[in-house]
């Protein structure tokens, strides 16, 4: 997920009515204010509003939109990437300079994040200044101008953004993996293809926003904000584009492999099969399986030697390596498998040892104690992910877009506990028997092909 931060703001919301003043709550007579329960509202136009008044000194508001790269097509690839970088361009209510200078003046922050499914525009700052930040959020998301010369000026930034991201070999592998695993939708890249650099027009940006930034595809989420204020803002200013927008295609899994021979001494390889869509019991089983095999070190600078995958590979290779289970769930599909990093000469033995460990689990070679430990790791990881306001806001927004509702952590933990040992074995069997996808890069002379596993 790419995070881009901008500083900026403006004074009034262009030609529309002034946004309501956000009042800071105060405790009468020194009585401490208690955090409120999460409030959830779905408007008739489909827009979801969720808020939690925690009386924190900082407020955070996020507008989540079903406008990730999966909603692009072959003619407008890279549009969502450029859109992430265009958050501080001139709008109908403020120039680019005014946006940047305004939020900087109040110590605020704008972040734009994106996945293959969604985009999220988030502002945060001192709660007494949330009116300014909220107005800016509304202006950026509902009234962009996308002036041609400003869009053209983003070309160099687009190149740099992609180049920096692709310095990480894992980013390139995950991009290639989705490209080879799917025929459409989820195959679309998070980063603009090179041949599209400088060719995305302001008209394409306007078309994408008009057809995807609609009320029924949005969720407005706030922390440290009154629900009534958030609802009033949504009803007044986020009702400009009705309807469902353009329907996205269902992801079609295909399988295959892509090998990038570049001579690097370290070989990165990911091998996956189609798993399960997010939000169902099977997806929970794959998550438990991921933590059973090893989801990465849980100790800072640790070597993850306690995971089943690491133990298995260590028996078959004396070279340095890193191995973990890979798990990604989307609204209509998912990928599960293994990710290895190894010396080029040892790539074959590392990959085969890791793959054989998953096969062993598929054959029922696991204990109830191991499954319970995996559940505990999964639950701890989930709770820690929603412990911060940033993680909590993201979780609420993602659930609101996916299901139109919110599932509290207690319910999530219950669902994890309900996963049986047999469910984990079944998930492992699905991976072993499923059609595989593979992406690899490095000096691949000793890296096996899919049909050699």
UniProtKB/Swiss-Prot annotation:
Cellular component GO terms, alphabetical: mitochondrial inner membrane; mitochondrion; myelin sheath; nucleoplasm; respiratory chain complex III
SUPFAM superfamilies recorded: LuxS/MPP-like metallohydrolase
A molecular-function term among this protein's GO annotations: metal ion binding
UniProt-listed InterPro entries: Metalloenz_LuxS/M16, MPP/UQCRC_Complex, Pept_M16_N, Pept_M16_Zn_BS, Peptidase_M16_C
Localization terms from the record: Mitochondrion inner membrane
Keyword set includes Nucleotide-binding: no
Name of the featured protein: Cytochrome b-c1 complex subunit 2, mitochondrial
Native source organism of the sequence: Mus musculus (Mouse)
Lineage: Eukaryota, Metazoa, Chordata, Craniata, Vertebrata
């Amino acid at each position: 997920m790419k995070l881009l931060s901008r500083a900026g703001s403006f004074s009034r919301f262009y030609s529309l009515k002034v946004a309501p003043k956000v009042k800071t709550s105060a405790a009468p007579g020194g009585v401490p204010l208690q955090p409120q329960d999460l409030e959830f509202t779905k408007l008739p136009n489909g827009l979801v509003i969720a808020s939690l008044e925690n009386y924190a000194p900082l407020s955070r508001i996020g507008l989540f939109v079903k406008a990730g790269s999966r909603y692009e097509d072959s003619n407008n690839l890279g549009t969502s990437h450029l859109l992430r970088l265009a958050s501080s361009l001139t709008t109908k209510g403020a120039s680019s300079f005014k946006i940047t200078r305004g939020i900087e003046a109040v110590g605020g922050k704008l972040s734009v994040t994106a996945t293959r499914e969604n985009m999220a525009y988030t502002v945060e700052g001192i709660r007494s200044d949330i009116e300014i930040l909220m107005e800016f959020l509304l202006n950026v998301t509902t009234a962009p101008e996308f002036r041609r010369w400003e869009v053209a000026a983003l070309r160099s930034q687009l190149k740099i953004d992609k180049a920096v991201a692709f310095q990480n070999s894992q980013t390139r592998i995950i991009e290639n993996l989705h490209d080879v695993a799917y025929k459409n939708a989820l195959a679309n890249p998070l980063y603009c293809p090179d041949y599209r650099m400088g060719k995305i027009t302001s008209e394409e940006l306007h078309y994408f926003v008009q057809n995807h930034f609609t009320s029924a595809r949005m969720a407005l989420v706030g922390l440290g904000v009154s629900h009534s204020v958030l609802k009033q803002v949504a009803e007044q200013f986020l009702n400009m584009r009705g309807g469902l927008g353009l329907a996205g295609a269902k992801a079609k899994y295909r399988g295959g492999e892509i090998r990038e021979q570049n001579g690097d001494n370290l070989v990165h390889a990911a091998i996956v099969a189609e798993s399960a869509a997010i939000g169902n019991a099977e997806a929970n089983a794959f998550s438990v399986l991921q933590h059973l095999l090893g989801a990465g070190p849980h100790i800072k600078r640790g070597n993850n030697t306690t995971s089943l995958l690491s133990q298995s590979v260590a028996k078959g290779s004396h070279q340095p390596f890193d191995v973990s289970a890979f798990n990604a769930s989307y609204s209509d599909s998912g990928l599960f498998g293994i990710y290895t990093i190894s010396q080029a000469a040892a790539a074959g033995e590392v990959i085969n040892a890791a793959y054989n460990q998953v096969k062993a689990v598929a054959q029922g070679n696991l204990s109830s104690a191991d499954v319970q430990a995996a559940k505990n790791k999964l639950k701890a990881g989930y709770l820690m992910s929603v412990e911060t306001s940033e993680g909590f806001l993201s979780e609420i927004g993602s659930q609101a877009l996916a299901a139109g509702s919110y599932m509290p952590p207690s319910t999530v933990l219950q669902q994890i506990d309900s996963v049986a040992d047999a469910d984990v074995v079944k998930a492992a069997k699905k991976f072993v028997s499923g059609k595989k996808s593979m992406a690899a890069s490095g000096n691949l002379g000793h890296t096996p092909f899919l049909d050699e596993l």
